[in-house]
Design a protein with these regions (language model features):
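A short, well-structured juxtamembrane/interface segment
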Residues: 22-41
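Glycine-rich, small/polar surface segments that engage phosphate groups of diverse ligands
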Residues: 39-133
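Surface-exposed amphipathic alpha-helices with a cationic face
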Residues: 156-163
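Generic N-terminal amphipathic, Lys/Arg-enriched alpha-helix
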Residues: 1-22
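Cofactor-binding loop segments of dinucleotide-utilizing enzymes, especially the Rossmann-like FAD-
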Residues: 50, 108, 145, 171-172
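Glycine-centered short loops/turns at secondary-structure junctions
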Residues: 42-43, 137, 163
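Short, glycine/polar-rich helix-capping loops at beta-to-alpha or helix-loop-helix junctions
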Residues: 168-180
Length: 180
């Protein structure tokens, strides 16, 4: 089965389980396509949100940086390099490292966050991190139940200015985040 058919099957199953998602089925597929393209091109995902959405950001990153449902092995070329550098340690690393989809949560930097809140404009903390970490072709995922969280909106604008793609995960049909 080709990837597109598999994706559609998964999306249909998702909508079957959660019928409220029917109206955003095309958006889910578009978000997948953005992420697939970014990862295929060696890019990364930056994720931010507030409160419960911050927890979601951390969880998403955790699942991408290690196996989720299926094992993701590291590439054989990396295994060869590991063993060449140090046979014993390289073998342990080769046996236990997991393939990762590069992702960074912007909510888990207490030193930067508190310094920025003390010395700069607190609402710009995610935008500052996007500015420092983001590169053209990367993806910014802003999670906001309302879709109107100012710090997430500023980060989306910063992301667009640097050539990142922006995905908004919101709970509201109409919101400010959808314009980015």
């Amino acid at each position: 089965m080709i990837m597109e058919e598999r994706l559609l099957k998964h999306v249909e199953l998702l909508v079957e389980r959660y019928p409220a998602l029917e109206s955003c089925k095309d958006d889910i597929i578009a978000a997948y396509d953005l992420l697939e393209e970014a990862y295929r091109d060696g890019r990364k995902l930056l994720v931010a949100g507030n409160g419960g959405s911050a927890s979601d950001a951390e969880h998403i990153v955790g699942e991408l940086m290690k196996e989720f449902k299926l094992k993701r092995k590291i590439y054989s070329a990396q295994i060869d390099r590991l063993v060449k550098i140090d046979a014993e340690m390289g073998t342990v690393l080769a046996d236990h490292l997991q393939g990762s989809l590069p992702a960074i949560s912007l909510v888990g930097e207490p030193s930067l966050t508190t310094a920025f809140m003390n010395d700069a404009v607190p609402v710009l903390i995610f935008a500052q991190q996007v500015n420092g970490l983001g590169r053209a072709g990367d993806v910014f995922l802003g999670i906001s139940t309302s879709g109107n969280s100012k710090n997430v909106l500023y980060a989306a604008v910063a992301a667009k200015s640097k050539g990142l793609k922006v995905i908004g995960l919101t709970g509201q049909k109409e919101n400010q985040l959808e314009q980015y």
